[in-house]
Amino acid sequence: MNSYLQFPHRKLFIQFSYSLTSVFRKCQSRTFMNSQFASAKLSNSIKKYFDGRIDESIKYQEIFIRGLENKGKLSKTSLVEALARVRAKPETVLYKVADPNENNKYPICSIISYTELSKLRENQSSRLREAEKSKHKNKTRTRYVLFSWRTDVNDIERKLKSVKDFLQDGNIVEIHVQNKKRSQPVSQEVRDSILSKIQLEIEGLGKDMKPPIVNSHSATFLLQPLVSKSSEL
């Protein structure tokens, strides 16, 4: 009697267990599908660069996909369905064009070729490089020019040309005039003559950022350009 009563329960348990197993296998199969990139041939560097923007790395269950039915029209679909379309087209990838915003509840995606994705990366990298170059190009640099009280006329002219070039290029220039080591001090007349020449040559190109520091041994000028090169362009 006991065996007979237990039999239906055992049968029911076996059926219930089998049903759970089927559901588990179904879930496991879906997880496996979503754990691998639909575009398996893409290089790891491409996947890393576009992480969060291509294939299974797109973290949305529902998306808008462009050109699914009509070119330029957005169609709502699931990520799983979109990835199935990608797998059906060799050498293609699902690319997230735009994130959700106040006008679109879901991200906008598009199916593009590997070639288009590579060009997209090249263009984005190129824009980043140009922006970095522009940032450094527009950054004001400080140039240093050293004079000696006993500098001859030709050397003064050469160094003053460097000062003018630096100012015209939009750089800050620090001019320092001092005695050479183990050289005899020069007269006040010579010092005044050199300082007057420096001030005359830079007139119209630069202005003092702070008052010059002048004493019996040295003189220091910190100049900024009157007109930067970028503002002239």
UniProtKB/Swiss-Prot annotation:
Keyword annotations of the record: Initiation factor, Mitochondrion, Protein biosynthesis, Transit peptide
Task: State the InterPro entries in the record.
Answer: T_IF-3_C_sf, Translation_initiation_fac_3
The molecule here is called Probable translation initiation factor, mitochondrial
Its family remark reads: Belongs to the IF-3 family.
Point out the transit peptide region: 1-39
Q: Name one GO molecular function term.
A: mitochondrial ribosome binding
Which domain of life does the UniProt lineage start with? Eukaryota
Any single GO BP term? ribosome disassembly
Q: What does this protein do?
A: May be involved in mitochondrial translation initiation.
**Subcellular location, record wording:** Mitochondrion
List membrane-spanning regions. none
One GO CC annotation, please? mitochondrial matrix
Major place of residence: mitochondrion
